[in-house]
């Protein structure tokens, strides 16, 4: 195994919390002219913790995980993306001092749905939350505290 590949495997193993004993490393090689591939276990075991690391004939590093682990990873990513979305929208709303946060949230979500419907190729992570909330504030000023008006009243 090349040093560079060993280093990548070590780094990835550390990220996944795998010890040397838990690492499963296999080599992928051509078996015959039919394009079949052969997996040769280099270290670890076929019952070892996932992910497994595979090294192809060209020295490329691959990983293999079970469908349940892949589903778990996708689910975790979706939850993190949803949480990130919610936090960004919440921050944008709170910066503009809403009278009723829940009402503003609903109107902003409706606006985001409109934008998403118009631009179906747009990723929700690329939405400019500040622009959405500003639009909602300009169209529905009654949903937000008018600080300028409050200051004017206090100065009188």
Swiss-Prot record:
Annotated InterPro entries: UPF0763 (IPR019724)
Family statement drawn from the similarity comment of this UniProt entry: Belongs to the UPF0763 family.
Protein name as catalogued: UPF0763 protein CHAB381_1696
Organism: Campylobacter hominis (strain ATCC BAA-381 / DSM 21671 / CCUG 45161 / LMG 19568 / NCTC 13146 / CH001A)
């Amino acid at each position: 195994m090349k040093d560079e590949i060993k280093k990548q495997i070590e780094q990835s193993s550390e990220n996944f919390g795998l010890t040397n004993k838990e690492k499963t490393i296999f080599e992928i090689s051509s078996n015959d002219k039919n394009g079949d591939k052969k997996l040769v276990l280099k270290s670890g075991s076929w019952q070892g913790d996932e992910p497994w690391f595979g090294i192809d004939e060209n020295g490329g590093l691959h990983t293999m995980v079970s469908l349940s682990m892949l589903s778990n990873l996708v689910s975790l990513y979706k939850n993190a993306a949803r949480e990130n979305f919610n936090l960004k929208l919440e921050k944008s709303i709170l910066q503009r001092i809403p009278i009723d946060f829940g009402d503003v949230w609903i109107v902003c979500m409706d606006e985001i749905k409109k934008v998403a419907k118009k631009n179906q190729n747009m990723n929700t992570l690329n939405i400019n939350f500040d622009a959405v909330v500003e639009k909602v504030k300009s169209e529905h000023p009654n949903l937000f505290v008018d600080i300028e008006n409050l200051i004017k009243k206090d100065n009188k």
